[in-house]
């Protein structure tokens, strides 16, 4: 999802699916059905539709929580990053039943339309299917490891990060907004090569759009996307550490009913009892559990369901941990159990 520092390169890195212990829990992936994406009562600093155009560059990113017509559940990640100097596509697939995992990263030439959302790197990309660049969008990946073709609709109220949609990010600023629960259909190809149809009544996509006025990024960050079942709450939680700029930020943007937004400080503590050693760098060890307190809102104990959920590249630009997580916690004094994603980005010096 994230806006990363540009680096030169041409590479394709992938791993085949891996077997793991079967995970029997099922999840409620019902999409929202909002009538409008953004009413405009809160004055954000950009037009959502305009930022979709290829000329804006930056990051186009989705996580899709899907249920097939055979009642199998998958977690899909898809990401196009475009900067003046480099472009990449990466994707992953996690079977939430048996925890089979596959991923790839491809750095190469981007073809795009300056005035609309139409981005392609190799056989993968994002494409607007509506004139407004927003109402209906396609994400597709044709790699042998991760193959899917998804259509997602803007049936959800937007979430502009930090309330206005813009915040400090390294030495510059970044803008970021999300459509957190889009109706989704299409198909994916399973590990055995069989094609599976997605049930749109039991599937949704979080679409995240980000760019900025400075290509530099913080040294490290951990970002969480959390969904609170049986409520309208969607959380985007940033924890940013950048020693060069002295930026150590922890904040959550909470979207509730309608355009209800809260921007709240966060207490963040990674737990290194369980860890995963990066495939990309011997200097990177990922924690697999975290304790978070969102001030005035709730507390969460978050855990990755599978240790190896790393998208493996050859640099910090290409590599990220994009893991499906579950959590237990309390919101409004009530016990909650939910799911989401953790994204972990490590600084370039770990690859040198």
Predicted regions mapped to residue ranges:
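Fungal secretory targeting signals
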Residues: 1-20
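Structured soluble/peripheral alpha/beta segments that form catalytic or ligand/cofactor-binding pockets
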Residues: 21-352
């Amino acid at each position: 999802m994230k806006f990363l520092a540009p680096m030169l390169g041409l590479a394709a890195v992938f791993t085949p699916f891996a077997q793991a212990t079967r995970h029997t829990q099922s999840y409620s992936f019902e999409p929202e059905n909002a009538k409008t994406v953004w009413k405009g009562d809160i004055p954000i600093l950009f037009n959502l539709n305009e930022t979709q155009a290829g000329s804006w560059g930056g990051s186009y990113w989705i996580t899709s929580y899907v249920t097939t017509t055979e009642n199998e559940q998958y977690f899909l990640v898809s990401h196009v990053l475009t900067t003046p100097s480099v472009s990449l596509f990466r994707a992953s697939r996690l079977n939430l039943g048996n925890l089979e995992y596959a991923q790839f990263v491809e750095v190469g030439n981007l073809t795009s339309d300056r005035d609309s959302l139409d981005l392609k790197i190799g056989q993968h990309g994002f494409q607007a299917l509506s004139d407004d660049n927003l109402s209906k969008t396609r994400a597709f990946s044709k790699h042998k490891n991760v193959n899917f073709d998804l259509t997602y609709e803007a049936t959800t109220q937007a979430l502009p990060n930090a309330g206005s949609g813009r915040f400090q990010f390294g030495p510059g600023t970044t803008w970021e907004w999300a459509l957190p629960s889009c109706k989704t259909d299409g198909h994916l190809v399973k590990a055995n090569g069989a094609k599976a149809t997605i049930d749109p009544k039991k599937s949704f996509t979080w679409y995240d759009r980000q760019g900025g006025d400075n290509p530099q990024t913080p040294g490290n960050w951990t970002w969480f996307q959390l969904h609170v079942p049986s409520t309208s709450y969607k959380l985007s939680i940033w924890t940013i550490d950048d020693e060069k700029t002295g930026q150590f930020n922890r904040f959550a943007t909470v979207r509730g009913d309608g355009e209800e937004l809260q921007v709240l400080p966060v207490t963040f503590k990674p737990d290194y009892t369980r860890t995963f050693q990066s495939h990309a760098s011997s200097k990177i060890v990922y924690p697999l559990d975290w304790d978070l307190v969102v001030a005035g809102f709730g507390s969460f104990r978050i855990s990755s369901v599978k240790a190896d959920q790393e998208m493996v590249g050859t640099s910090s630009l290409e590599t990220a941990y994009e893991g499906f997580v579950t959590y237990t916690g309390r919101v409004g004094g009530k016990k909650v159990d939910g799911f989401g994603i953790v994204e972990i980005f490590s600084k370039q010096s770990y690859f040198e």
